[in-house]
Amino acid sequence: MRKIAVLSLFLCLVAVCRAQYIGSQYVDVKLGYIVDESQVQGTFGFGKVYKAFKVGANLNYRNLNRDLVKANTVTVGPELAYYALKGRKFSLLGIAAGTIGYQKAKAKSDLVYLEKSKAFVYGYEVGIRPEMLLSPKVALFAEYRFEMLFNSILRNNNQVGLGCVIYL
């Protein structure tokens, strides 16, 4: 057990040391709120930072539980964020992302009960993200995104979110 722990620690250290400069790789976590439908969304992302932009991938999960509809949606996709402003403590990024995923929904009413529906969903997101650096490796951000999700119960959404970025 001790050997496994030492080996795991060594592998983590090697992964961090492989970064060419501080901030070359990142992991972020976001808790979002879809304003149009009062829906919560969780996002986990990772990627690489370049001089003027970030390239990464996101995994999203959202749960909609309303009187007439109950739906769960999981999406993944690439993300490109461009630094519109980049300072020592504050950055402003423009975001473009693609999404592809799966939605499972159940629609119901007092008169009609419909079976579960499953759908392949795809779409895009555009947005803006101000980011504040707390230390060389940790940043907090707020975010606004407009999302168009085809084949979904909810096609277009306005999202706001708060999150944290850890630079490796």
Predicted features, each with a name:
Residues 156-168:
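Outer-membrane beta-barrel "beta-signal"
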Residues 47-51, 81-85, 129-133, 165-167:
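Structural signature of outer-membrane beta-barrel channels/translocons
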Residues 29-43, 65-71, 88, 148-157:
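Solvent-exposed loop/turn segments connecting transmembrane beta-strands
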Residues 29-33, 44-48, 57-61, 78, ...:
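Transmembrane beta-barrel strands of outer-membrane/channel proteins
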Residues 24, 55-74, 100-122, 153, ...:
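Flexible, solvent-exposed loop segments that connect beta-strands
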Residues 18-64, 165-167:
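Short glycine/proline- and aromatic-enriched beta-strand/turn motifs that initiate or cap beta-hairpins
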